[in-house]
Amino acid sequence: MKALDQLTFDNRFARLGDAFSTQVLPEPIADPRLVVASESAMALLDLDPAQAELPVFAELFSGHKLWEEADPRAMVYSGHQFGSYNPRLGDGRGLLLAEVLNDVGEHWDLHLKGAGQTPYSRMGDGRAVLRSSIREFLASEALHALGIATSRALCVIGSSTPVWRETRESAAMLTRLAQSHVRFGHFEYFYYTKQPEQQRVLIDHVLEQHYPECRDAEQPYLAMFRTIVERNAELIARWQAYGFCHGVMNTDNMSILGITFDFGPYAFLDDFDANFICNHSDDRGRYSYANQVPIAHWNLSALAQALTTVIEVEPLKEALGLFLPLYQAHYLDLMRRRLGLTTAEDDDMALVERLLQCMQRGGVDYSLFFRKLGEQPVAEALKVARDDFIDLAGFDAWGADYLARCRREPGNAEGRRERMHAVNPLYVLRNYLAQKAIEAAEAGDYSEVRRLHQVLTRPFEEQPGMQAYAERPPEWGKHLEISCSS
C-alpha cells in the first residue's frame, strides 16, 4: 500500500486541451477535518488506509495542498434538465484534480466536489455543504455494496467555512472516484455548439480509454454506443430491483460509463410506491421511481442525437431498441433471485407484477418484505409476511401461486435462505438514517456517519448490535423532503 506522496498520475483528460476543460485551482475551506473515509475506495488507489488519519490527507482533499503532478480542471458540458436543453453547464463547483494510475493499470479520476467557483459556476458560490456531501458519500458506498454500478466516494472533509442555502450551513468537500467523469452532456455540448472536430476528439478519447473492446468492431462508434445502451439497461434494472430512486436524471447527470452518478435528492423506497417522487422540486414526477426506465431511454436518445455526426440514424435507432428488452431481462433475473427462484418460467414476470400491485395497495416495506420471505420455509414465511398487507385476498392468491411456483423448483429447499439473503439486503440507506447521521455531524460528532457507513458496506450480513439499522422507518422518516439544494 502507498503513501499519499507515492501515487502515480496520468492526466489523460487534461491533455485533451482547453476546449474540453479550464484549469482552475481549488479554493480551500477553513479548518479542514476528516468526517469519513472509505477504506475500500482508498484501496482502488493503492492507498494505505492509515493515510486518512494524517493532517496532509485533509489538506490535500480540502484544497489547501496539491500534488505537483495534479492538473485541476473544470469540465465543460451541457445537458437536458427536466426535459429542457441547457446550453452551457459544466463543473460549477467541482474539479477534476488528477487521474491516478494504480498498480493494476486502472485510471481513477480524483474529483473534488465543493472546490469553489469556476467559469461554469453561473450564480453559484462553488461550494458543497456538509449535508449533501455526506449523502453522496453514503449513497456511493451503499450502492457499491449492493452490487450496483456507481461512482465511489473517497472521503468527506468538513470545515468551519459558512455557506448559505435555505439556512446557514458549513462547507465541505467530497472526493469522488470514477474511471471517467464524461457525461452524456459532454457530447451534447459539442453537438449543439457545432464543434464536430472537438466532438470527434472526445469520442475517440472515450473509445480508446473506456471502450477498447469496441475498437476492432466493423463500426467502432456504433459498437461503443450499443455497449453504453447495454450498461444502462443493466444499471436501471438494478435500481428498480433494489428500489433506488436517483431523483435528477438529467442528461448531464448520466455517466458515459453506465454508472450511478451525481447524487442529488435520491432515496430508497420505504413502503413500496411505484409513483414515489424523491425530489420535492420534481412537481410533475418526471423522475419518479416508475419513470426511471422510460427516462433512461429518453436520455440515451438524447445521446444518440448528439452522435449523429459520426453514426447513421438507423443503426442508432436499432441500438436504442435493445434497451427495453435488455432492461426487462436483467430486471426479471434480479427479481427471480430476490424471490429465491433459480429457474425461469414464462409467467414469472406476471408473478412479480402481481406482488408489486399487492404492495402498492398499502403498507408494505419493499426491502424488508424480501428479507422476511427468505427467513423461513416458504409457507411459514408467507404467513408472517401476510400481516404487512392490506389487500389480504390479493396477497393470499399471490402467495398460493408463489408457493406452487417454488414447489416446481428442482431439488429441495436446501440453501434457499442463504441464496435469498445473499441478494436481499437487511440494511439499506434510508433517508431518516442518513438524516440522523447528518444532524450529528453538523453538531461535530462524526461517529454516526462512520458507523452507518460501516453497516452499509455489508448490507446482506446480519451484524451484531446493529438491529436498529434494519428496522422499518418511523412515520416521520418515510416522508422526508429532499431538495436539489446542496
From Swiss-Prot:
GO molecular function: AMPylase activity; ATP binding; magnesium ion binding
Annotated binding of ATP, by residue: 90, 92-93, 113, 125-126, 176, 183, 262
Active site per UniProt: 252 (proton acceptor)
Catalytic activity: L-seryl-[protein] + ATP = 3-O-(5'-adenylyl)-L-seryl-[protein] + diphosphate; L-threonyl-[protein] + ATP = 3-O-(5'-adenylyl)-L-threonyl-[protein] + diphosphate; L-tyrosyl-[protein] + ATP = O-(5'-adenylyl)-L-tyrosyl-[protein] + diphosphate; L-histidyl-[protein] + UTP = N(tele)-(5'-uridylyl)-L-histidyl-[protein] + diphosphate
Swiss-Prot/TrEMBL cofactor(s): Mg(2+); Mn(2+)
UniProt-annotated binding residues for Mg(2+): 253, 262
EC class: transferase
Alphabetical UniProt keywords: ATP-binding, Magnesium, Manganese, Metal-binding, Nucleotide-binding, Nucleotidyltransferase, Transferase
Highest taxon in the source lineage: Bacteria
Disulfide bonds: none
Keyword Metal-binding: yes
EC number: 2.7.7.-, 2.7.7.108
Record-linked HAMAP family: YdiU_SelO (MF_00692)
Family affiliation: Belongs to the SELO family.
Chain's role: Nucleotidyltransferase involved in the post-translational modification of proteins. It can catalyze the addition of adenosine monophosphate (AMP) or uridine monophosphate (UMP) to a protein, resulting in modifications known as AMPylation and UMPylation.
Protein name: Protein nucleotidyltransferase YdiU
Gene responsible for this protein: ydiU
